[in-house]
Amino acid sequence: MKKAIVSSLSFCLAVTSFMNNAEEQKPKKLEDVQFLSITYTDFKHGKTDRAMEIIKNHYFPASKKAGTQVPYIVKFQSGEWDMATLWNLKNGYSSMEWEVTEEGIKWLKAFNKQEGKEKSKEIRDEFNSLIQRSNHVIGYHPTDIE
């Protein structure tokens, strides 16, 4: 019984404290940040080199030809993931409202022109077949940190 009373009292104090702070708070938008879309990728055993070959020899050249963003790639030497791909979300979270982006369309057109429509599909299918699993997150980098 004593534990129940102490727990209830602690909860009430925490809620009251939160409510007081909520009344004092004002909306605040994040400033000086760069929003990022980050994909962690784990390739099937022995397939990382082929995946990197496709990225360097096919995907990056198409990005450059299309004038679209070339992602920042991090290859891990430890941990559960083989690679992280980071994309700058130029329009912040609102970039995620698009099912198909203008930049994505430009890239695919350049990739199809570079490889041929049928070959481009084969390359994309092959790349996807190399992936064991992946995870996608959104975050931000404070740009006022040097």
Predicted regions and their residues:
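Sec-dependent signal peptide cleavage junction
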Residues: 19-35, 144-146
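Short amphipathic
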Residues: 38-40, 137-143
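Short, solvent-exposed polar/charged micro-motifs at secondary-structure junctions
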Residues: 16, 82-85
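An amphipathic, aromatic/His-enriched active-site/gating alpha helix that lines ligand/cofactor pockets
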Residues: 5, 27-30, 57, 61-72, ...
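Short, surface-exposed ligand-recognition loops at beta-strand->loop->(often short) alpha-helix junctions
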Residues: 42-52
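Active-site-flanking beta-strand signature of metal-NTP-handling nucleotidyl enzymes
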Residues: 32-42, 84-85
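Bacterial Sec-dependent N-terminal signal peptides
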Residues: 1-26
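Hydrophobic pocket/interface hotspot
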Residues: 39, 51, 85, 95-96
